[in-house]
UniProtKB/Swiss-Prot annotation:
UniProt family annotation: Belongs to the RecF family.
Protein name per the record: DNA replication and repair protein RecF
Gene Ontology terms: cellular component: cytoplasm
One annotated GO molecular function: ATP binding
Matching SUPFAM superfamilies: P-loop containing nucleoside triphosphate hydrolases
Compartmental location: Cytoplasm
Length: 361
């Protein structure tokens, strides 16, 4: 799985770019503010329908332009496909696959599985539970065909239930929502638990390479007491939920906790160690997908050198090479990525939104 070509139009500070990409490493080098992160973000947006630095389309469309357009050629298991995405300032989104309109962003996500590592990615470890739920849900989305529909339906029903809690006085008035919510909640929790169990060995092995000095443990918390029946719990907690005006327990409150030597990692590890752990989690998840489905992730690394010393950068470079996946790396200078440069790599110089291929010695 690799992008062989990327066309960018009116995205961030990039007016127009047409990039022939390497199947291995693609380095984006340039000073801060040059647009190298914008290239990473264009790749990410092509596979997610949204940018990773802003959820508002208007903020990623180039100044005074009506829309951005992204187009890519994908080499997927000896089959080439074309994918395209455009979004207007009004939020209108168009997805094209192999020249036909009417496709969903979820189809792009299936075609282009990606792992993103950014300086802001520490939220996976020290942010709220929603970031760790997203980690599990990425895996469930790519491993369970029914997950996306089930999770979308559950979110819709929970939103309706929360709105109803502001208007009802008796539990019987919202029982109809709960009868739909309960089987979805149980199924989603089963998928998450199964995925966290399945990937645990991969995470442990990768973390042992990156952080051998710590004994790491992982636990999935489904969002309600494991000894309780979810339906009975919703009924018992009705008065509390009504006072709060939201549903306080369920899969939307799940978490995936990580401890080092029995202590939450965010309380014990340095920033450099947290970044290594974040990288280990992303790599383990990508490699697990490859082993399960034969598909390789695209890895996107923004500001590669931040928080990592030379030895840790070299270790990460070796692990990324071992995946044989396509990798996009941004850095201020070529020296920061010297350990990653190889025959299958390509270097791009980015300045003021202009992108040029650089010859490699």
């Amino acid at each position: 799985m690799a992008l062989t070509r990327l066309l960018i139009k009116d995205f961030r500070n990039i007016e127009s770019a047409d990039l022939a990409l390497a199947a291995g490493f693609n380095f984006l080098v340039g000073p801060n503010g040059s647009g190298k992160t914008s290239v990473l973000e264009a790749v990410y947006t092509l596979g997610h329908g949204r940018a990773f630095r802003s959820l508002q389309a208007g903020r990623v469309i180039r100044h005074e332009c009506a829309e951005f357009v992204l187009h890519g050629r994908v080499d997927a298991n000896e089959r080439e496909a074309s994918v395209g995405l455009s979004k207007s300032r009004q939020g209108d989104t168009k997805v094209r696959i192999d020249g036909t309109d009417g496709h969903k962003v979820a189809e792009l996500a299936q075609m282009l599985p990606m792992q993103l590592i950014t300086p802001e990615g520490f939220t996976l470890l020290n942010g709220g539970p929603k970031f760790r739920r997203a980690f599990l849900d990425w895996g469930c989305f790519h491993n369970e065909p029914g997950f996306f529909t089930a999770w979308s339906n559950l979110k819709r029903l929970l939103k309706q239930r929360n709105a109803a809690l502001r208007q009802v006085s008796r539990y019987t008035q919202i029982r109809a929502w709960d009868q739909e919510i309960i089987p979805l909640a149980e199924r989603i929790s089963e998928w998450r638990a199964a995925y966290s169990d399945a990937i645990a060995a991969d995470i442990s092995a990768t973390c042992a390479l990156f952080l051998p000095e710590f004994a790491l443990s992982f636990s999935f918390q489904r969002g309600w007491d494991k000894e309780s029946d979810y339906g009975e719990l919703l009924e018992r907690q009705f008065e509390r939920d009504r006072a709060l005006t939201y549903t306080a327990v369920g899969p939307h409150k799940a978490d995936f906790r990580i401890r080092a030597d029995g202590t939450p990692v965010e309380d014990l590890l340095s920033r450099g160690q947290l970044k290594l752990l974040m990288c280990a989690l992303r790599l383990a998840q990508g490699e697990f997908l490859t082993r399960q489905s034969g598909r390789r992730c695209l890895y996107l690394l923004d500001d590669f050198a931040s928080e990592l010393d030379t030895g840790r950068r070299r270790l990460l470079a070796e692990r990324l090479k071992a995946t044989q996946a396509q990798v996009f790396v941004s850095a201020v200078s070529a020296e920061q990525v010297a350990d990653m440069v190889g025959e299958k790599g390509k270097m791009f110089r980015v300045e003021h939104g202009k992108i040029e291929v650089q010859p490699q010695d």
